[in-house]
């Protein structure tokens, strides 16, 4: 098998939420190569309390050598599917605008996120799962 990518999903159940880690792996020669982790996205799916039915996404990362190939979008699609499977109705994300360029907001908007709130220096965006 030639070069490719695949994802693995790990779910840890807690009392009030499920923590999810989705890892992205890359291989050059599937039969003779040890895959390397080149991306990750993490999310928490809340089962009870104020945020019940919401999934919060954080820590989306793709290694620089593997960017511009649609892999971050692939990880986010996997995160949305997993959140929906675990009962989330909404997926949210937030970050500091001081630490991220504005194009990040535009990218998430293209993924279907709407800007729900802006705090001083912070952004919160949501989309249905």
Language model regions located:
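Acetyl-CoA-dependent GNAT
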Residues: 1-58, 82, 118-119
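Conserved acetyl-CoA-binding loop-helix of GNAT-fold acetyltransferases
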Residues: 62, 68-81, 110
């Amino acid at each position: 098998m030639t070069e490719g990518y695949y994802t693995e999903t790990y779910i840890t159940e807690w009392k009030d939420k499920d923590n999810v880690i989705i890892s992205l792996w890359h291989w050059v020669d599937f039969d003779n190569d040890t895959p390397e982790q080149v991306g990750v996205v993490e999310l928490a799916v809340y089962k009870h309390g104020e945020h019940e039915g919401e999934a919060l996404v954080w820590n989306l990362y793709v290694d620089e050598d593997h960017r511009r190939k649609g892999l971050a979008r692939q990880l986010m699609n996997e995160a949305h599917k997993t959140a929906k499977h675990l009962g989330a109705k909404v997926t949210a994300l937030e970050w500091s605008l001081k630490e991220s360029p504005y194009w990040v907001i535009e990218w998430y908007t293209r993924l279907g996120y709407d800007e729900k709130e802006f705090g001083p220096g912070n952004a919160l965006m949501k989309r249905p799962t």
